[in-house]
Amino acid sequence: RDVFMWDGGLPQDPQPPFDYMLTFSIAGLTNEYAEPAVFLRDGRITEVEPMTELETVEFPEPVGTLEAFVTGGGLDTLPWTYEGKLRTLQNLTLRYPGSFVKLRAFYDLGLWSLGPVMVNGVPVVPRDVFHTLFAPKVTFPEGKDMVIIRIKAVGEKDGKPAEAWIELIDYYDDETGFTAMERGTGFSAAIVAEMMWRGETPRGASGVERMVPPGPFLKELEKRNFKVEMRLVEVQGHGGQ
């Protein structure tokens, strides 16, 4: 009935002032930060402003307390696939405490804008300036990262109120030198490519949730040392999050 997701890629050893480590395209990062999210609210497609709805989330040590807030793009085609089937579907991005207020300031200043502004008579794109200044501050070639994913689904099991939880915390691989972000994105793509080659996915193009069988996909993740934890909990009442 209600599905809540949290995820993020973070440095294992955060360095001030930004407590972040760039592990993919900075253009992709600012796209997520600057663009509205698309969620399901009351069963309907709903556009939500980025850099809003700040909350605190607790994880087991050594992760600890993190911030979570709205950014764009995290759900891809899921809202359209599950419109009318779920009441709530949302995804929040995880960052270290104190990150939100800094990022919100960049957003409010317009530093992620793509519209040129005049500086000493010269048109300048604020986002290009931000990329040039910010990227060196969050680039750590020797740094080690982690990827965190948590999903909470609220509904019923055998007619009784229940919650299903899925959690993954993956770390930089010292043996291969792969970052956690590389592991999570690269292995996922490779697994699906193999499944396509074996004829285990339907032909055509659609959202991954329609095309990839979850059971076999999870088994392939386990072969690559991803530790996905799943649990089902009976709860009292019929509340939301």
Show the residue positions of the predicted features.
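C-terminal catalytic/substrate-binding lobe primarily of soluble NAD(P)-dependent oxidoreductases
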Residues: 2-241
